[in-house]
């Protein structure tokens, strides 16, 4: 089995093709392991589709499936073009969501994640039981639960330095309480937003999360008067340009091809 590794905004993914759907959870855990595998944040299985250029199954590094992953959508878009699966502009199916891809330059990829849904507005009082004394999160008056393909809890702090003082145990507790990824952000100015994301499936801070950046962007737009176009900067410091067009969330940034890996034992074990 051949895997192609791509990176988008600091997230890295292994991408391979299959001609039929099956459960690749164990394979994802094996190949995504940082020490005993090739190492990646997730595994993308590219599958044939009757109605789209292709479709995918996406697995987190712990083997759990996810309906959507923003940065992986840009990576698989470039992979599909480079492997003659799809043209520069194409549409693929991620779970039940149509994702459109536009390759503007050799490694600048724009992805349309589609629409979003505001699930809940959560006052600080509902979250205080998860905070330690003098927690940075105590300063967040309101959290926003937003679905951008997967659910995200978003909160904004007033000091950029507080992003470096977040407590992993608190974020993990929030992640399980709301069954969502956790995003803490700082709005530096009208068009620049910094953020940190604690991601489900990774179960830790991640260098970047595309759907998380989309959720932060939407919350900033709806509740903090951010413009329809902004630059978001995650932990990796690799910025993404997000924009809102006709209620669709578009985001654009660099995708890098890292290399190719071969796992011969998969054929022997009949996993493919």
UniProtKB/Swiss-Prot annotation:
Residues involved in substrate binding: 11, 60, 70-71, 181, 199-200, 210-211
One Gene Ontology term from the biological process aspect of the record: lysine biosynthetic process via diaminopimelate
One Pfam family linked to the record: DAP_epimerase
Source taxon at top rank: Bacteria
Signal sequence range: none
Known catalytic reactions: (2S,6S)-2,6-diaminopimelate = meso-2,6-diaminopimelate
Subcellular location per the Swiss-Prot or TrEMBL entry: Cytoplasm
Keyword annotations of the record: Amino-acid biosynthesis, Cytoplasm, Isomerase, Lysine biosynthesis
Example of a GO MF term: diaminopimelate epimerase activity
Active site: 69 (proton donor), 209 (proton acceptor)
GO cellular component, one term: cytosol
EC code(s) of this entry: 5.1.1.7
SUPFAM superfamilies to which the protein is assigned, alphabetical: Diaminopimelate epimerase-like (SSF54506)
Pathway assignment: Amino-acid biosynthesis; L-lysine biosynthesis via DAP pathway; DL-2,6-diaminopimelate from LL-2,6-diaminopimelate: step 1/1
Primary location: cytoplasm
Site-annotated residues for Could be important to modulate the pK values of the two catalytic cysteine residues: 152, 199
Alphabetized InterPro entries for the sequence: DAP_epimerase_AS, DAP_epimerase_DapF
Function: Catalyzes the stereoinversion of LL-2,6-diaminopimelate (L,L-DAP) to meso-diaminopimelate (meso-DAP), a precursor of L-lysine and an essential component of the bacterial peptidoglycan.
Subunit structure and binding partners: Homodimer.
Family indicated by similarity: Belongs to the diaminopimelate epimerase family.
HAMAP family: DAP_epimerase
Protein name in the entry: Diaminopimelate epimerase
High-level lineage: Bacteria, Pseudomonadati, Campylobacterota, Epsilonproteobacteria, Campylobacterales
Gene name of the record: dapF
